[in-house]
From Swiss-Prot:
This is Plasma membrane proteolipid 3. It comes from Debaryomyces hansenii (strain ATCC 36239 / CBS 767 / BCRC 21394 / JCM 1990 / NBRC 0083 / IGC 2968) (Yeast). Keywords: Cell membrane, Membrane, Transmembrane, Transmembrane helix. GO terms for cellular component: plasma membrane. It is a multi-pass membrane protein. Belongs to the UPF0057 (PMP3) family. Pfam families: Pmp3 (PF01679).
Length: 57
């Protein structure tokens, strides 16, 4: 799977602020809200979920 420039940008944003990376990829879907909860509970789970969402879609 080839990465585009926007994918790399979203990955960098996801490391800094995970919910924003998910929002840029999926919009205001359930993945966004799940990521907000995971980021509040722990920063690392939020990053892992954000990277999963970005790399999957």
């Amino acid at each position: 799977m080839a990465f585009t420039c926007s994918d790399i940008f979203k990955i960098i944003i996801a490391i800094i602020l995970p919910p924003l990376g998910v929002f840029l990829e999926r919009g205001c879907a359930s993945s966004f809200w799940i990521n907000i909860v995971l980021t509040i509970l722990g920063y690392i789970p939020g990053i892992i979920h954000a990277l999963y969402v970005i790399l999957k879609y």
